Amino acid sequence: MIPLSHNNTPTELENYVKLKGQSLTIQDFSAHDFQGVKKIVRDRLHTLQGELCVYCEKKYSVDEMQVEHIKPKSGRNAQPNLCFTYSNYAVSCIQENRKTQTCGQKKKDNILFIEPTSPSCNSHFSLDTDGFINPRGFKNRKEKHSIQTTIDMLGLNKPHLQLERKKQIERLIYILKATKHNRHELTNKFIKSGNFKYILRELTM
């Protein structure tokens, strides 16, 4: 998960909200006149996130991403007051195949117990050498369940993600074993250059 620190709200989004005023509703998020603003928001976040999905940390083109409400705008957990709040936005991946859908598509209108807006979000996870993400740092059974629910809600251990992480870990271990000098520098460079750059730092061996 990317620990997301938002920059300034795009001017276009601020202007749209001001223009609509009291008439603004969550339906406007899908309205034709908001799509240009949404594209600006998506492009900005895509760059901010280093072209990675906020949840699975895989790299995607901007057209393979959607603007995600971290706290849902509709449904039983709706927080419509945050529908046009920039700090409630992230971009997450889009999968056409329903079997491989993860992240925002799988989360839908549910509430995450661990959100990417927390700087310490990844401290709740550990990554094993098989590529599985597991709960960590929990104080009791309830907290462990909350962490596991977040992992499951986002589908972070779906086979295709787990296998891709495993391959990346194997490459990292190879570098560690093959390198005698500048090991820290080389492993840092490897982690920063690819997918899973944050969760890889939670690897336990």
Curated annotation (Swiss-Prot):
Any one Gene Ontology BP term: defense response to virus
Keyword line: Antiviral defense, Endonuclease, Hydrolase, Nuclease
GO molecular function, one term: endonuclease activity
Known role: Putative HNH endonuclease component of antiviral defense system retron Vc95, composed of a non-coding RNA (ncRNA), a reverse transcriptase (RT), a probable ATP-binding protein and this protein. Expression of retron Vc95 confers protection against bacteriophages T2, T4 and T6. At multiplicity of infection (MOI) of 0.02 cultures slow growth when infected with T4 but do not collapse, at MOI 2 cultures enter growth stasis.
Record protein name field: Retron Vc95 putative HNH endonuclease
Origin organism lineage: Bacteria, Pseudomonadati, Pseudomonadota, Gammaproteobacteria, Vibrionales
